[in-house]
Amino acid sequence: MFFVLSPAKNLNEKDPCPVSEFTQPDLLAESEILMRQLRELAPQQIAELMHVSDKIALLNAERNAAWHTPFTPENAKQAVFMFNGDVYEGMDANTLNTNQIQYLQGHVRLLSGLYGLLRPLDLIQPYRLEMGTSFANLRGKNLYEFWGGIITNLLNDTLAQAGSNTLVNLASQEYFKSVNTKKLRARLITPIFKDEKNGKYKIISFYAKRARGLMVRYAAEHNITDPEMLKNFNYEGYAFNDAASNESEWVFMRSEQIK
């Protein structure tokens, strides 16, 4: 069983990594192709392409200029500790023990606009390139066309090597669109997290993102290899709702949070 997650725009570059083990991204040669083109963009072009402020555009122009291989622990950081959004706050990998970190490395993959598909301990250098960005490139008009079948093929190889036939999709639609589900050789399960608000259950983005990270943490802490065991996920008040679920979409609900 493998999980796929989205990356995060917010990055934690400063805090030291709690583990020394690292791996290298499998698709780094592809990243270098993209980065050569990204480096050609002036800050104003980055601002327009990514719809960000001048300050963020300048930061990322500087990141692009500084980006270089080979990646080492001195100039890069393991992806699961670099990404710093809601999903990763829910996962809170910094407080997992060594065995649990190894679980992440063996069962979790992170989708990325620049790096394609990452293991949690793959070294990465800071960047900003969301998968949905309309970044025209050598292979097409956007990143979905750039990556083509590359991410799906690597996922299939990863699943086959592990003898796994289940992929749990905890990524956003923007990122999971980079996976060709018709060519994916695995059973696909998509957990959906709904919170009660004013008596109705619906997806609330912040809570849903955090819950995705919490589910990965739950799996790591319980060393889960059987997908059915994920139905016992109960962190922070969530509970599996069988009536609202089907074979491929598993719905977890939580009663309204009393502030």
Curated annotation (Swiss-Prot):
GO biological process, one term: response to hydroperoxide
Pfam families according to UniProt: H2O2_YaaD (PF03883)
Superkingdom of origin organism: Bacteria
Any one Gene Ontology cellular component term annotated for this protein: cytosol
PANTHER family linked to this entry: PEROXIDE STRESS RESISTANCE PROTEIN YAAA, PEROXIDE STRESS RESPONSE PROTEIN YAAA
Segments crossing the lipid bilayer: none
Annotated protein name in UniProt: UPF0246 protein NGO_0461
Family from the record: Belongs to the UPF0246 family.
